[in-house]
């Protein structure tokens, strides 16, 4: 979608001692898009900037911010490039502030995220359909990638694996022939129009054993608690505590990993605090958030549930309609 920003600075890449120019134009431009591109490029040619630094300096001067005022920047390493134009004492680290702004989505963004969820659901459903005795995780993973491509989207990542190799997202070797009773765990992510789709599910081939059922019953308690509590006003830290407590009280006392994160242009849109720790934040209407519950029991396997929720005035709307239960095939 076109940007809603009132003014945008374009710049060229510098190369070979000059400017790397890309566009030439036909005499007659047939579409509005062509005419918009021509207008932007020709405006840039009147006063060309080489590189983002020149463009940023020009913008600061036009706004009078080289003389006074505070400037928020989402990467304070860029301050060094503005030396002589903007003194460090007038720079504010606006990383979290800009993340927080992005967390409340526009109608266009919500529409794209709905599309991303639908495409991701189609892809994970296709992958689930390939699960059979003797199949490997690589085959299942490949089915996901093929369906993502057929949806016109792009694979971002597809964790986790099957059986004892379904715990631990970073395993270098996930080759494993699936057996009856094994869980197959998905953490499946794609990009659509630069926005993320992200969903997790746990599938079992055949009937789950007693341990898996016990664990999933505990997960269900946590999932239900999260759905019930997710609404404007709740702090994500409180939501996490309630979810973890519900899982622990219902059969999985060692459970640790549940959290909520924003999703959009980035996989995880969450304010950060010192040391790279994920920060808590109050939930607001029109945020798009993922609720995420994961178990990594090395030597046994994993259990996963995650999906995307649009925060409404009084609660939350699911963007996926995949079944919420342990999926048996």
Task: Enumerate the language-model features and the residues they cover.
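Active-site neighborhoods and metal-handling regions in enzymes and metal-associated proteins
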Residues: 1-329
């Amino acid at each position: 979608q076109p940007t809603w920003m009132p003014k945008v600075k374009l710049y060229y890449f510098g190369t070979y001692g000059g400017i790397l120019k890309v566009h030439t134009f036909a005499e007659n431009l047939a579409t509005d898009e062509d005419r918009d591109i021509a207008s932007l490029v020709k405006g840039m040619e009147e006063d060309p900037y080489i590189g983002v630094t020149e463009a940023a300096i020009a913008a600061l001067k036009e706004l009078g911010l080289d003389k006074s005022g505070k400037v928020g920047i989402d990467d304070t390493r860029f301050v060094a490039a503005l030396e002589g134009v903007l003194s460090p004492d007038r720079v504010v680290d606006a990383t979290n502030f800009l993340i927080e702004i992005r967390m409340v989505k526009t109608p266009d963004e919500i529409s794209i995220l709905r599309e991303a969820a639908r495409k991701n659901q189609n892809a994970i459903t296709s992958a689930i359909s390939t699960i059979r005795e003797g199949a490997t995780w690589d085959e299942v993973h490949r089915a996901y990638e093929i369906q993502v491509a057929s949806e016109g989207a792009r694979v971002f990542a597809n964790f986790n694996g099957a059986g004892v190799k379904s715990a631990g997202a970073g395993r270098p070797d996930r080759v494993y022939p699936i057996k009856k009773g094994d869980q197959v765990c998905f953490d499946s992510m794609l990009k659509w129009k630069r926005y993320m789709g992200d969903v997790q599910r746990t599938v079992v081939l055949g009937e789950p054993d007693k341990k898996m059922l016990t664990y999933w019953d505990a997960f269900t308690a946590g999932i239900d608690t999260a759905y019930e509590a997710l609404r404007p006003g709740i702090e994500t830290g409180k939501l996490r505590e309630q979810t973890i407590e519900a899982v622990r009280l219902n059969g999985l006392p060692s459970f640790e990993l549940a959290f909520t994160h924003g999703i959009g242009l980035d996989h995880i849109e969450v304010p950060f605090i010192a040391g790279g720790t994920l920060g808590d934040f109050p939930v607001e209407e029109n945020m798009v958030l993922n609720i995420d519950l994961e178990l990594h029991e090395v030597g046994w396997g994993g259990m996963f549930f995650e999906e995307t929720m649009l925060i409404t005035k009084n609660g939350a709307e699911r963007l996926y309609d995949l079944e919420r239960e342990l999926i048996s095939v």
